[in-house]
């Protein structure tokens, strides 16, 4: 007899009360996300499924939820695990503690370094975790054709991966020129996703309402890049599922939530996109988004629906997202609806969090191993020289807690015909070094906003191609930072003015992920922040994550690649020194 048949027979026998349930949650106030109503009910669970809601009393295990509130497990509709710097197994430990029982992830960070091998590694690690981890295949590796990433993934490379049971579609399509022009390989990627029974996620940063219509015509059905109510509303009106983002840098919830109404709320879900482990530990994940939405005036019933059923249906996941017979037993028991205070988390019928504490005995972590590509770079001091004549320069202006940048036009004073740090205007040198193929490509630019007093810092986390990016007040400090992250096999390093290493975070898995428990990673990140505060006066934003997005050319306005400045709006490379 097949496992599915046995499971079905067991579920029916339990639902008809011929046998006792494995577990019953009794006397709780249960949210029906289909109509937003609450009712005091008992929930019967058999194996990993809910088999009935109502008059059930006999079970091997009773959970008393008197005075508590019961909602479906939360779903993160779009997340890059790599941005947490931990493996999928470690991600599961922190997310389940926050009531997140399923995630939909795009492994395009590791794919940009290690190609298909990187994707398969993440799928394998996801299967080891207690979390349900669904994968969308990276659509744009590299993000745009001119990027020097560690891999180039064509439609033919991705197609075999649709055979993996946890792969459910094509991830955020960010190469909008390829879509608009009908570029052959991009259209093939979209076609393969749809033919496989999957769906296609969008990445519509800066797209107009008319351009959103083009995305819809191409079969792209979701977007997580809305930063204003108007952008979110335009996508919703076009028929898109809108994922409202609350990450470490991209904190869009309060700017977007006003677009949600009782009549259109079923088109909205929540996502984190990119969130550091430190923020996952202090704020939470989707539970934090729900809390923000409720505080902003969204009815709790709608907020919890957005965090569960809406996300599940947007991703065509028909067995999660609700507390109903036949659905997977992914359940969160709350002490408070408004504060989203979590008491118990049940994953596939098993209690994994009780009294707000994780049951560590259930988390048998297996050490992740991955043969990372060697870092190939030979940057020299001469590569960092930035000649100037007039001193009229283009400068990247960081926007704290945003991935967009300002394109600044400033005047600096050349020092013997080249740029030297302008402390008064807070302008320092920024460098991107190609690390995958030993091309020798080095992009040099200028950035304002880090308020560095001395030293430098560097990281191999540099979206999306993940070359080495560094900023510093001297070429010597920049070179030291680059050399250190190379020596440790990838990671982040802080250097002081005396060229001493103040702190680091080794990321041996593709220069993106640690192989350590998330608590250790968090301590290392704290050390980096402390080190940064000793060489900078800037506060109120994450400097490492901010730096990592200054290299992403598919986000406005001015970015730096290993080939130089890229102007998003003109879609062209430009020089540091202005011609006029």
Model features per residue range: what roles?
Residues 1-41, 45-46, 96-98, 281-297, ...:
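Active-site microenvironment of metallo-dependent hydrolases
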Residues 28, 48, 67, 78, ...:
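Divalent metal-coordination and catalytic microenvironments
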Residues 24, 73-75, 135, 270, ...:
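Residue-level marker for buried hydrophobic side chains located in beta-strands
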Residues 80-82, 108-110, 138-143, 173-176, ...:
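Active-site beta-loop-alpha junctions enriched in small/polar residues
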Residues 2-15, 20, 92-199, 499-506:
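Divalent-metal coordination cores built from histidine and acidic residues
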Residues 118, 152-172, 178-243, 250-271, ...:
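Histidine/acidic residue-rich metal-binding segments in metalloenzymes
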Residues 19-22, 57-60, 66, 70-72, ...:
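Short coil/turn connectors at secondary-structure junctions
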């Amino acid at each position: 007899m097949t496992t599915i048949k046995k499971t079905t027979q067991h579920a029916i026998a339990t639902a008809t009360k011929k046998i006792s349930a494995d577990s019953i949650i009794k006397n709780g106030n249960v949210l029906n996300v289909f109509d937003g109503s609450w009712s005091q009910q008992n929930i019967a669970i058999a194996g990993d499924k809910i088999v009935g809601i109502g008059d059930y009393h006999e079970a091997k295990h009773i959970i008393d939820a008197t005075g508590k509130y019961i909602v479906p497990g939360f779903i993160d509709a779009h997340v890059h695990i790599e941005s947490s710097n931990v493996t999928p197994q470690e991600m599961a430990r922190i997310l389940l503690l926050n009531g997140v029982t399923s995630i939909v992830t795009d492994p395009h960070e590791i794919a940009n370094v290690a190609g298909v091998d990187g994707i398969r590694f993440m799928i394998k690690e996801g299967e080891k975790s207690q979390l349900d981890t669904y994968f969308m295949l990276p659509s744009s590796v590299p993000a745009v054709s001119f990027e020097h990433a560690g891999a180039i993934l064509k439609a033919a490379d991705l197609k075999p991966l649709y055979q993996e049971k946890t792969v459910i579609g094509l991830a955020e399509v960010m190469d909008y020129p390829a879509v608009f022009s009908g570029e052959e390989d991009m259209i093939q990627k979209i076609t393969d996703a749809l033919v496989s029974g999957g769906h296609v996620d969008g990445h519509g940063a800066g797209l107009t309402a008319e351009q959103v219509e083009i995305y819809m015509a191409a079969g792209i059905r979701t977007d997580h890049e809305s930063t204003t109510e108007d952008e979110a509303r335009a996508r919703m009106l076009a028929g898109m599922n809108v994922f409202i983002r609350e990450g470490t840098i991209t904190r869009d919830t309060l700017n977007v939530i006003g677009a949600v109404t009782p009549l259109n709320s079923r088109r909205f879900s929540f996502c984190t996109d990119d969130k550091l482990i430190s923020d996952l530990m202090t704020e939470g994940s989707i539970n934090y988004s729900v809390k923000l939405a409720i505080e902003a005036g969204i009815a709790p019933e709608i907020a919890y629906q957005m965090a569960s059923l809406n996300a599940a249906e947007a991703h065509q996941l028909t067995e999660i997202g609700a507390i109903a017979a036949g659905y997977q037993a992914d359940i969160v028991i709350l002490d408070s609806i408004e504060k989203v205070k979590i008491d118990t988390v049940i994953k596939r019928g098993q209690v994994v969090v009780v009294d707000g504490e994780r049951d560590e005995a259930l988390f048998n972590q297996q050490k992740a191993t991955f043969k990372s590509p060697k870092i190939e770079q030979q940057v020299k001091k001469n590569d960092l020289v930035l000649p100037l004549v007039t001193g009229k320069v283009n400068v990247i202006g960081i926007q704290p807690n945003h991935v967009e940048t300002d394109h600044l036009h400033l005047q600096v004073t050349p020092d013997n015909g080249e740029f030297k740090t302008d402390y008064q205007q807070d302008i320092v040198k920024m460098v991107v070094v190609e690390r995958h193929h030993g091309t020798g490509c080095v992009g040099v630019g200028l950035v304002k906003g880090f308020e560095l007093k001395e030293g430098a810092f560097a990281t191999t986390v540099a979206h999306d191609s993940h070359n080495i990016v560094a900023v510093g007040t001297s070429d010597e400090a920049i070179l030291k930072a680059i050399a250190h992250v190379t020596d440790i096999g990838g990671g982040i390093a802080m250097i002081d003015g005396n060229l001493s290493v103040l702190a680091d975070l080794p990321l041996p898995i593709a220069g993106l992920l640690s192989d350590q428990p998330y608590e250790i990673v968090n301590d290392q990140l704290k050390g980096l922040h402390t080190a940064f505060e000793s060489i900078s006066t800037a506060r109120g934003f994450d400097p490492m994550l901010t730096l990592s997005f200054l290299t992403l050319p598919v986000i406005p306005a001015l970015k730096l690649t290993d080939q130089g400045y890229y102007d998003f709006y003109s879609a062209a490379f430009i020089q540091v020194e202005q011609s006029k």
